[in-house]
Regions:
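Noncatalytic, solvent-exposed loop/strand surfaces
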Residues: 1-343
Length: 343
């Protein structure tokens, strides 16, 4: 079974013969689609969270589709009208009333009963954009999402953000003027990346007048004293790093309604990856965030076991894997790190 965001679902046998296909509308999304279909019994389940609205409506056309694995026929669909684009693949969990489909997206973690897809519970607190896939183990669901913009820590260090913008200080006076916001300048989201990298900062319009207006707004937002400069103290004092909070939670499935206060056993707010999914092994959770920071968390208590910096820098986009007693972590720059599992 394969899913292409630009086409839909296809099914092949092991000789590569197409058995059926199901064209689907391409979800509208800033970054494209990344959710994979998952199988449950005779069903194939796909979540298509979407920025596009239903016809003549102000609510999203996001939905969960359940298809027959045999012929691609739609068995049921459940709309998610208040959800927008998301990139997390759902997972299956065993709740107190049976199996559940667990979906992370648009600020919340939600559980749907199987096989009928009825929504049962939700847990809140995540940022708008979530990518990692939830995990299950030890009778819990573990789900994670960084702060919007990629910040991994609740109390992020503001200095890298200042270093990213002061690099555009053309006259070298230690301050930034509006006229120095040239070239690849934008407000940084991920200061560990070079300016000009697609993930470095706030996307700017291509049209000159709109681009100028956006940069004017960025400058005025930080220049609170209106002296025509950003200096280090003013920038750091006025800096807001993303929206929402970086979050890893442990949730007991099987609840009803909003379970944020009743079934979330713990939350953790440091070293949360933006793109990679965490991995659970021997009651420990391992996470790698941008900049090459490896964080290990006790899965029962939600307490940090250790936090170490790897040799790689820049972005970490690949999810870690475990082979034997070794954790394998690959950076975007091509560095592969092997770390012994355990405390």
């Amino acid at each position: 079974f394969v899913y292409f965001g630009s086409f839909g679902l296809l099914c092949y046998d092991h000789e590569g013969k197409e058995l059926w296909k199901k064209p689907l509308a391409t979800p509208r999304s800033l970054y494209g689609t990344s959710c994979s279909p998952i199988a449950y019994g005779e069903m194939l389940i796909l979540v298509t969270d979407d920025d596009a609205n239903l016809p003549d409506s102000k609510v999203s056309r996001s939905r969960i589709l359940a298809l027959s694995k045999k012929n691609g026929r739609t068995l049921w669909e459940r709309h998610r009208p208040f959800h927008r684009s998301g990139w997390s693949t759902p997972t299956l969990a065993k709740g107190s009333q049976g199996m559940e489909l667990v979906v992370l997206g648009n600020g919340s973690l939600r559980g749907y009963s199987l096989p009928d897809g009825e929504e049962k519970w939700q847990g809140d607190g995540f940022s708008r954009e979530t990518i990692a896939r939830p995990m299950t183990g030890n009778g819990k669901v573990y789900a994670s999402g960084s702060r919007l913009g990629g910040s991994a820590d609740l109390n992020a260090d503001p200095l890298p953000f200042w270093k990213a913008v002061i690099g555009f200080d053309a006259n070298g006076d230690g301050r930034l003027e509006r006229k120095e916001m040239t070239g690849h300048f934008t407000f940084p989201f991920r200061p560990q990346l070079p300016p000009g990298h697609p993930g470095f900062g706030l996307p700017l319009p291509q049209e000159a007048e709109k681009r100028k207006a956006r940069l004017d707004g960025i400058f005025l937002r930080m220049d609170k004293n209106r002296d025509g400069f950003w200096d280090k103290d003013e920038f750091i004092g006025n800096l807001t790093i993303g929206r929402g909070k970086p979050l890893l939670v442990a949730v007991r499935p099987g609840g009803l309604g909003n379970v944020t206060a009743s079934r979330v056993e713990w939350e953790f707010n440091r070293g949360i990856p933006e793109v990679p999914s965490p991995i659970l092994h021997d009651r420990l959770i391992y996470m790698v965030s941008n900049g090459g920071v490896l964080t290990c968390v006790d899965a029962d208590l939600g307490k940090m076991v250790y936090r170490r910096r790897l040799g790689g820098y820049g972005q970490y986009l690949a999810s870690p894997v475990i082979a034997g007693n070794r954790l394998l972590l690959a950076s975007e720059e091509g560095l592969l790190s092997l770390v012994r599992t355990g405390r």
